[in-house]
Amino acid sequence: GGDGSLTGANRFKGEWSSLVKELLETGKITKEVAEKHSHLNIVGMVGSIDNDFCGTDMTIGTDSALHRIVEVADNIIPTAYSHQRAFVLEVMGRHCGYLALVAGIVTEADFVFAPEWPPEEDWPEKLCKKLELERQSGQRLNIIIVAEGAIDRQGNPITAEGVKKIIVDRLEMDTRTTVLGHIQ
């Protein structure tokens, strides 16, 4: 997977004509076979849950990963609701927040952290204010989704544990984290 596979395929394509010529010169193929196979087309299918490859709507694996994230959120929500908890879900995606963003929309998350959109410096205050307002309006649970590559505007990582600490320290709200990792 990744750039190594694409680089190898490109190199193989570049060497194809010399390989065919060598086979012809050593008598392993005929002139007709060499002419018939003088050009090589390579087709690749991108397999990446991150959905971070240009030129494709959705990479293989993205839909399955998103399904797993939503499934986990669906399993967490009843517990969060009954215990009036906040849950911080950390999802994969390296430097691509696609999974976090779409999962945030589908699960109606209160806050989403994605690498492409580092939050403003006062994000902890805005997060806490949002959660307070939601609770004051009668909401019994909160969902916050953090992409694994999320950073602030200074390039510092934003992690599920870091977000949990802010919520617990500032709001004294019962908060749990779930890092999905490779189960998605």
Swiss-Prot record:
<dbReference type="InterPro" id="IPR022953">
    <property type="entry name" value="ATP_PFK"/>
</dbReference>
<dbReference type="GO" id="GO:0048029">
    <property type="term" value="F:monosaccharide binding"/>
</dbReference>
<feature type="binding site">
    <location>
        <position position="176"/>
    </location>
    <ligand>
        <name>substrate</name>
    </ligand>
</feature>
<comment type="subunit">
    <text>Homotetramer.</text>
</comment>
<comment type="pathway">
    <text>Carbohydrate degradation; glycolysis; D-glyceraldehyde 3-phosphate and glycerone phosphate from D-glucose: step 3/4.</text>
</comment>
<dbReference type="GO" id="GO:0005945">
    <property type="term" value="C:6-phosphofructokinase complex"/>
</dbReference>
<comment type="function">
    <text>Catalyzes the phosphorylation of D-fructose 6-phosphate to fructose 1,6-bisphosphate by ATP, the first committing step of glycolysis.</text>
</comment>
<feature type="binding site">
    <location>
        <position position="3"/>
    </location>
    <ligand>
        <name>Mg(2+)</name>
    </ligand>
</feature>
<keyword id="KW-0021">Allosteric enzyme</keyword>
<feature type="binding site" description="in other chain">
    <location>
        <begin position="92"/>
        <end position="94"/>
    </location>
    <ligand>
        <name>substrate</name>
    </ligand>
</feature>
<dbReference type="InterPro" id="IPR000023">
    <property type="entry name" value="Phosphofructokinase_dom"/>
</dbReference>
<dbReference type="GO" id="GO:0003872">
    <property type="term" value="F:6-phosphofructokinase activity"/>
</dbReference>
<feature type="active site" description="Proton acceptor">
    <location>
        <position position="50"/>
    </location>
</feature>
<dbReference type="GO" id="GO:0061621">
    <property type="term" value="P:canonical glycolysis"/>
</dbReference>
<dbReference type="GO" id="GO:0046872">
    <property type="term" value="F:metal ion binding"/>
</dbReference>
<feature type="binding site" description="in other chain">
    <location>
        <begin position="48"/>
        <end position="50"/>
    </location>
    <ligand>
        <name>substrate</name>
    </ligand>
</feature>
<dbReference type="GO" id="GO:0016208">
    <property type="term" value="F:AMP binding"/>
</dbReference>
<feature type="binding site">
    <location>
        <begin position="2"/>
        <end position="5"/>
    </location>
    <ligand>
        <name>ATP</name>
    </ligand>
</feature>
<keyword id="KW-0547">Nucleotide-binding</keyword>
<protein>
    <recommendedName>
        <fullName>ATP-dependent 6-phosphofructokinase</fullName>
        <ecNumber>2.7.1.11</ecNumber>
    </recommendedName>
</protein>
<keyword id="KW-0418">Kinase</keyword>
<keyword id="KW-0808">Transferase</keyword>
<feature type="binding site" description="in other chain">
    <location>
        <position position="148"/>
    </location>
    <ligand>
        <name>substrate</name>
    </ligand>
</feature>
<dbReference type="GO" id="GO:0070095">
    <property type="term" value="F:fructose-6-phosphate binding"/>
</dbReference>
<dbReference type="InterPro" id="IPR035966">
    <property type="entry name" value="PKF_sf"/>
</dbReference>
<dbReference type="GO" id="GO:0006002">
    <property type="term" value="P:fructose 6-phosphate metabolic process"/>
</dbReference>
<feature type="region of interest" description="N-terminal catalytic PFK domain 1">
    <location>
        <begin position="1"/>
        <end position="184"/>
    </location>
</feature>
<keyword id="KW-0479">Metal-binding</keyword>
<feature type="binding site">
    <location>
        <position position="85"/>
    </location>
    <ligand>
        <name>substrate</name>
    </ligand>
</feature>
<comment type="similarity">
    <text>Belongs to the phosphofructokinase type A (PFKA) family. ATP-dependent PFK group I subfamily. Eukaryotic two domain clade 'E' sub-subfamily.</text>
</comment>
<feature type="binding site" description="in other chain">
    <location>
        <begin position="182"/>
        <end position="184"/>
    </location>
    <ligand>
        <name>substrate</name>
    </ligand>
</feature>
<keyword id="KW-0963">Cytoplasm</keyword>
<keyword id="KW-0460">Magnesium</keyword>
<dbReference type="GO" id="GO:0030388">
    <property type="term" value="P:fructose 1,6-bisphosphate metabolic process"/>
</dbReference>
<keyword id="KW-0067">ATP-binding</keyword>
<dbReference type="GO" id="GO:0005524">
    <property type="term" value="F:ATP binding"/>
</dbReference>
<dbReference type="GO" id="GO:0042802">
    <property type="term" value="F:identical protein binding"/>
</dbReference>
<dbReference type="Pfam" id="PF00365">
    <property type="entry name" value="PFK"/>
</dbReference>
<keyword id="KW-0324">Glycolysis</keyword>
